[in-house]
UniProtKB/Swiss-Prot annotation:
Mg(2+) binds at residues 82, 150. HAMAP family: PyrG. This is CTP synthase. L-glutamine binds at residues 65, 362, 390-393, 413, 470. CTP binds at residues 24, 157-159, 196-201, 232. It comes from Halobacterium salinarum (strain ATCC 700922 / JCM 11081 / NRC-1) (Halobacterium halobium). Pathway: Pyrimidine metabolism; CTP biosynthesis via de novo pathway; CTP from UDP: step 2/2. UTP binds at residues 24, 196-201, 232.
Length: 553
């Protein structure tokens, strides 16, 4: 119990701390997000915090090959992609404060030391760093009933030690009934088909050595845990058997909440938190999620995703936005990966076979020629096209070159010496030296021209979407660009935000990233429009047909 001088737990939420063992990439974030979805359905206000134990202040300058996509929040925060999963599952907008990194913590502690806030004390990991971690978690949890806190990495990683120590202290400062430690661990099969518990036992042993005892164990496995395996885990890890849960592989991450519900994890958490009486009766809880993910699909379409990072996580939000649109349209979407650097290999065939084309954003010159070729194919063959950020900019470049005759037209980012810089640096970017957090970031409003495709998609004269860019359409070329069929149907002040083609069934580009605001229960309008155009244009094969389609996810 806390003393009078310690934190008052009555001011905060219930906390579920989620750690991972054995190996990274187990899906502890999806497990936590699924639990959060079910608690939200039960009528509780749920939020989430992702702890990333790296020294980067944020994810903004990290290589997508190493870390996956940089996810952008409304407030301009460039954060871990797991925050995207929390937003999609909880249908709540997060802030930069919901992503805690070692870099943020150390930066703040050092700045406070320099300003004399510590009054001459020796600044140490304990208590100064751990106190800052606890402060950040509690501030992010304000106003919620339940706060899910995911600790990135694996128990035992040296980078995560200060955070786990902070959680150990947290458990002593908080009432016992207000905190649960949930440990997600791997339960692999042996070669003879036996589920092995030893990795879990060793992982829990490591957690205990830090001073943390898990209250709940979730076994990630190919199939549900056998009863005798659950019993063995409970015995050797010192948790009740009814606190050992399975989280088996499923065909789609949006089915995980259904699995978690069947396992009873949400009910167990509510019981431990003494929240059952405050929860909505089961009959009154929303079934929207279940209805969506179990909805029958009546066809399938192939969408080519053109980008330069050969890693699915680098374009996670685009994949998910396509999935959300497919849930609304009632079709299966097969994503055909197209490496924009290999357009003239077998990838060119995928462009030709695709029912629709999405050209992703990115930075730098690598792969831009392939993206321009894909855009030209979409424009000339009336293939439904959606360009995002750089995809929007290159759609303007392609049109300038191949329709308006501006030979060599390009973005100044790619070719500083181009005769026709139809895409140029934002004016406010010229004097900046730092890369981190200096782009045009976050949610900005776009005015939409009535009577346009954009107006049809959004059903309004404005929209608010998230941005992440340094370059824009050069205002000096707008009159030339719009002289013959190209329309900028969305603007933010003097900035061009949306482009469309009057003589094309669906040629649509956005300077912003609509994928960041797409949710399973609220699909992004541009992605819905893309699939609608595909379905209008193509004969869609019945779901489960024997059509020979090459699919690369």
């Amino acid at each position: 119990m806390p003393t009078e001088t310690e934190y008052d737990p009555s001011l905060g939420s219930k906390f579920v701390f989620v750690t991972g063992g054995v190996m990274s990439g187990l899906g502890k974030g999806i497990t936590a997000a699924s639990l959060g979805r079910l608690l939200s359905n039960a009528g509780f206000d749920v939020t989430a915090v992702k702890i990333d134990p790296y020294l980067n202040v944020d994810a903004g300058t990290m290589n997508p090959y190493q870390h996956g996509e940089v996810y952008v929040l409304d407030d301009g925060g460039e954060v871990d992609l797991d925050l995207g999963n929390y937003e999609r599952f909880l249908d709540e907008d997060m802030t930069s404060d919901h992503n805690v990194t070692t870099g943020k913590v150390y930066q703040d502690v050092i700045e406070r030391e320099r300003s004399g806030d510590y009054l001459g004390k020796t600044v140490q990991i304990i208590p100064h760093v751990t106190d800052d971690i606890k402060r950040r978690v509690r501030e992010a949890a304000e106003g919620s009933d339940v706060c899910l806190v995911e600790v990135g990495g694996t128990v035992g990683d040296i980078e995560g030690m200060p955070f786990l120590e902070a959680l150990r202290q947290f458990s002593h400062e908080q009432d016992d009934e207000d905190i649960l430690f949930t440990h997600v661990t791997l339960v692999p099969y042996s070669k003879n088909g036996e589920q092995k518990t030893k990795p879990t036992q060793h992982s829990v042993k490591e957690l205990r050595s830090i001073g943390l005892q898990p209250d709940i164990l979730v076994g990630r496995c190919e199939d549900r845990l056998d009863p005798d395996v659950r019993e063995k885990i409970a015995l050797f890890c010192d948790v009740p058997m009814d606190a050992v849960f399975s989280n088996p592989d499923v065909e789609d991450i949006y089915h995980v909440p259904l699995t978690v519900e069947e396992e009873g994890l949400d009910q167990y958490v509510m019981e431990q938190f003494d929240m059952v009486e405050d929860a909505l009766p089961a009959a009154q809880r929303s079934t929207e999620w279940r209805d969506l993910v179990t909805r029958e699909r009546t066809g399938e379409v192939d969408i080519a995703l053109v980008g330069k990072y050969a890693l699915e996580d680098a374009y996670m939000s685009i994949h998910e936005a396509l999935k959300h649109a497919s849930l609304e349209a009632g079709v299966e979407v097969n994503v055909l990966w197209v490496d924009s650097e290999k357009m003239h290999d077998h990838h060119e065939r995928r462009i030709a076979d695709a029912d629709g084309i999405v050209v992703a954003g990115g930075f730098g010159s690598r792969g831009t020629a392939g993206k321009i070729d894909a855009i030209q194919h979409a424009r000339e063959h009336d293939v439904p096209f959606l360009g995002l950020c750089l995809g929007f900019q290159l759609a303007v470049v392609e049109y300038a070159r191949n329709v308006l005759g501006m030979t060599g037209a390009h973005s100044a980012e790619i070719d500083e010496d181009t005769e026709y810089p139809v895409i140029d640096l934002l004016p406010e970017q010229y004097d900046l030296e730092d890369l981190g957090g200096t782009m045009r970031l976050g949610a900005h409003e776009t005015a939409i021209e009535p009577g346009t495709l954009a107006h049809d998609l959004y059903g309004a004269t404005s929209c608010t979407e998230r941005h992440r860019h340094r370059y824009e359409v050069n205002p000096e070329y707008i009159d030339d660009l719009t002289a013959d069929g190209l329309t900028f149907s969305g603007e933010a002040g003097n900035r061009m935000e949306i482009v469309e083609h009057d003589d094309h069934p669906f040629f649509f580009g956005t300077q912003f990233h609509p994928e960041y605001r797409s949710r399973p229960t609220r699909a992004s309008p541009p992605f819905v429009g893309l699939l609608d155009a595909v379905l209008e244009r193509a004969d869609v094969a019945p779901a489960g047909s024997d059509a020979d389609v090459e699919v690369t996810n």
